[in-house]
Amino acid sequence: MRAGPGPTVTLALVLAVSWAMELKPTAPPIFTGRPFVVAWDVPTQDCGPRLKVPLDLNAFDVQASPNEGFVNQNITIFYRDRLGLYPRFDSAGRSVHGGVPQNVSLWAHRKMLQKRVEHYIRTQESAGLAVIDWEDWRPVWVRNWQDKDVYRRLSRQLVASRHPDWPPDRIVKQAQYEFEFAAQQFMLETLRYVKAVRPRHLWGFYLFPDCYNHDYVQNWESYTGRCPDVEVARNDQLAWLWAESTALFPSVYLDETLASSRHGRNFVSFRVQEALRVARTHHANHALPVYVFTRPTYSRRLTGLSEMDLISTIGESAALGAAGVILWGDAGYTTSTETCQYLKDYLTRLLVPYVVNVSWATQYCSRAQCHGHGRCVRRNPSASTFLHLSTNSFRLVPGHAPGEPQLRPVGELSWADIDHLQTHFRCQCYLGWSGEQCQWDHRQAAGGASEAWAGSHLTSLLALAALAFTWTL
């Protein structure tokens, strides 16, 4: 009898199969065609006209504002009072729309959904991102801790009022069932309805999935950033939500405690990795696009992220294979001339140069490695390798003529650049394309005919290497 494969071979095979499964095709870019989008969703519209501090935001693929008065934007955030009849308790402890999902009329909720969606997204034809930001309660019962325990208490009271003779453990079990069932129905009905009304938008819930890896405060010395196993399992309980979503919107807001530390990168990396795991696990033939919410400053402070933390947030998200990042901010960014001037200086000095670098590096990798039909994904998620323009090959130069971008990269591809990309990154193809370099076009295949070949990878590399590649916006 022949000996079977050794443990090393078996492990390698398992890892290879696992990694191949991870790289399901995903949705193509919906805005500029870039594989990695950087969006500015900060209410800075008053800096120029009101406070006389104009901001140059042309480096961002999308510019939007989360403020109430803005409609028909490429990114629309539906806060709790902007979409349907979201049940909750207000800050005074008063019940709103029944308090818990068990008390909501889905019929009345759907009726209000249509009115609000049509107000904020006024045409069916436009494509964009639609983010539902409901944070008062969580659909998994056990996650409603601390101030969210009010939703469990009311759920228990509802059951106890109907069954006063039941023992406490039975009341808790029934309350959990009723709450989770109603929460699931409420969220699913919401997604199904809004997708039908605005089908060209990508819909999902903000902060889903979460990783619950905030234990750096208690365990700084031993902090790894990993998502607790129990929270990964609880995310899998939400398979019904991932199956109905068309995009995922995790959050990686950095507390100043994590500033310029390895823990900051670990915090972000595992949150994004968990979102990407969920994105590829719950759909048979494709992976959901992941758009990562971050802030240009640290949480609760108007202090711009350091260069190290821009790499740990924007750079890490790009290298892991996210579809983009959304830089979000609130009204605190534009309270005075001083805050606007601080943002202007920070944009010019650090943020815009880094955004331009990463935006073009991801596009460059997509063209060189994936024929422009996919995005580059780090082979080893834990590696310290990023999609940055090589300083030996490219430089950023300012635009001078009217209408020119603030910065543009100029340079040419080198063999060292090609080798670096091939060694550290591989392709995740867009839907309709396959192959190691996304060279097979399935969109043109019909009736068993062989797929169209998008071109030899080696030929494209030789051509790129031969060209003096000048990047212009």
UniProtKB/Swiss-Prot annotation:
Glycosylated residues, chain numbering: N74, N103, N357
Gene3D superfamilies: Aldolase class I
Keywords attached to this entry: Cell membrane, Disease variant, Disulfide bond, EGF-like domain, Glycoprotein, Glycosidase, GPI-anchor, Hydrolase, Lipoprotein, Membrane, Receptor, Signal
Primary location class: membrane
Signal peptide (UniProt feature, chain positions): 1-20
Documented EC number(s): 3.2.1.35
Cystine pairings recorded for this chain: C47-C340, C211-C227, C365-C376, C370-C427, C429-C438
A Pfam family it matches: Glyco_hydro_56
Domain EGF-like residues, every copy: 361-439
Membrane topology: Lipid-anchor; GPI-anchor
The protein's enzyme class: hydrolase
Disease implicated: Muggenthaler-Chowdhury-Chioza syndrome: An autosomal recessive disorder characterized by distinctive craniofacial dysmorphism with frontal bossing, hypertelorism, a broad and flattened nasal tip, and cupped ears with superior helices. Other common but variable clinical manifestations are unilateral or bilateral cleft lip and palate, congenital cardiac anomalies, ocular features including mild to severe myopia and cataracts, single palmar crease, and pectus excavatum.
Protein name (Swiss-Prot/TrEMBL): Hyaluronidase-2
Native organism: Homo sapiens
